[in-house]
């Protein structure tokens, strides 16, 4: 086998919004992330109100009964 063909693993800091949130091993000393499980609503239990309508409601609001009448 060849020796020294793999990159060296060094302690790495995972950085989220300018703060170190975790440490691990990597080939890079710092890893900047946009999404982190510690701040995600699913993992924190935090509820966020999302103002979206369902597809059917959006369709009915847009076309109403006119779609059903023309379909006959």
Curated annotation (Swiss-Prot):
GO molecular function, one term: structural constituent of ribosome
Cellular component terms per the entry's GO annotation: ribonucleoprotein complex; ribosome
Keyword Ribonucleoprotein: yes
One GO biological process term: translation
Keyword Transferase recorded: no
Xref: Pfam families: Ribosomal_L31 (PF01197)
Lineage top rank: taxon: Bacteria
SS bond partners: none
Xref: InterPro entries: Ribosomal_bL28/bL31-like_sf, Ribosomal_bL31, Ribosomal_bL31_A, Ribosomal_bL31_sf
Keywords attached to this entry: Ribonucleoprotein, Ribosomal protein, RNA-binding, rRNA-binding
Subunit structure: Part of the 50S ribosomal subunit.
Family: Belongs to the bacterial ribosomal protein bL31 family. Type A subfamily.
Function: Binds the 23S rRNA.
Protein name (record): Large ribosomal subunit protein bL31
UniProt source species: Deinococcus geothermalis (strain DSM 11300 / CIP 105573 / AG-3a)
């Amino acid at each position: 086998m060849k020796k020294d063909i793999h990159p060296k693993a060094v302690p790495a800091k995972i950085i989220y919004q300018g703060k170190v949130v975790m440490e691990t091993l990597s080939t890079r000393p710092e890893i900047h992330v946009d999404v982190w499980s510690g701040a995600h609503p699913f993992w924190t239990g935090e509820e966020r109100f999302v103002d979206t309508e369902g597809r059917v409601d959006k369709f009915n609001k847009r076309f109403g009964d006119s779609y059903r009448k023309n379909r006959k």
